[in-house]
């Protein structure tokens, strides 16, 4: 791949859980005109340390710049670019689907095929929860759209490397 070819990259960024860190990280992207596809921030197994999973479409040159700039942010502890073939990544999708007594069984059948689940049932709708790859979630949405999608929300990817990545055990 040429340095100017744009491709999808997933970064796992360990940061100290301090006020304003998320703003500082997103501000770095914004100031330089880099677009974030998705960003998820969550606690890790180590108290006081959060993991940011950042997905971006960028060239190798831009990714080098992103990594250098992130390393300048003091509460950033470690940055790892996750390789697609050595990573498990999933997103969460919740969909409110029009479903009455007539079509509800078909909606539930479709949900079950995708190993998703119905988390709420109302008179004229159901709320479906699904986790999976972007492809799986898009396929489920394609199946549900003919019934009528009333509301939709989807998280960004959370990801873990299948290869052990040593992590810090203390805060500086």
Q: Residue locations for each model-derived region?
A:
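Short glycine-/aliphatic-rich beta-strand segments at the starts of folded cytosolic domains
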Residues: 7-15, 50-52, 87-98
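Helix N-cap motif at beta-to-alpha junctions
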Residues: 18, 57-62, 100-101, 132-137
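Short amphipathic alpha-helices in soluble, non-transmembrane regions
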Residues: 25-27, 65-73, 107-112, 140-145
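Short, charge-patterned binding micro-sites
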Residues: 36-59, 83-89
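Helix-adjacent hinge/juxtasegments
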Residues: 58-98
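Conserved short beta-strand edge segments in small beta-sheet-based binding/regulatory domains
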Residues: 74-86, 117-123, 148-161
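Long, charge-patterned amphipathic alpha-helical coiled-coil/hairpin "stalk" segments used as oligomerization
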Residues: 84-128, 134
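Single conserved hydrophobic/aromatic residue that forms the stacking wall/gate
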Residues: 163-172
């Amino acid at each position: 791949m040429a340095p100017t070819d744009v491709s999808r990259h997933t970064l796992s960024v360990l940061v100290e859980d301090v006020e304003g860190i998320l703003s500082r990280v997103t501000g770095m992207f914004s100031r330089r005109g880099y677009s974030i596809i998705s960003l998820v921030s969550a606690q890790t197994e180590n108290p006081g340390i959060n993991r940011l999973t950042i997905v971006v479409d960028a060239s190798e040159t831009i990714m080098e710049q992103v990594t250098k700039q992130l390393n300048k942010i003091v509460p950033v502890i470690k940055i790892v670019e996750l390789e697609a073939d050595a990573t498990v990544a999933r997103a969460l999708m919740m969909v409110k689907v029009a479903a009455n007594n007539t079509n509800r069984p078909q909606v539930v059948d479709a949900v079950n095929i995708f190993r998703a689940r119905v988390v709420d049932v109302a008179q004229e709708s159901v709320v479906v929860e699904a986790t999976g790859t972007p492809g799986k979630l898009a396929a489920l949405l394609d199946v549900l759209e003919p019934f009528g999608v009333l509301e939709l929300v989807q998280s960004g990817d959370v990801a873990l490397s299948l290869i052990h990545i040593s992590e810090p055990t203390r805060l500086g």
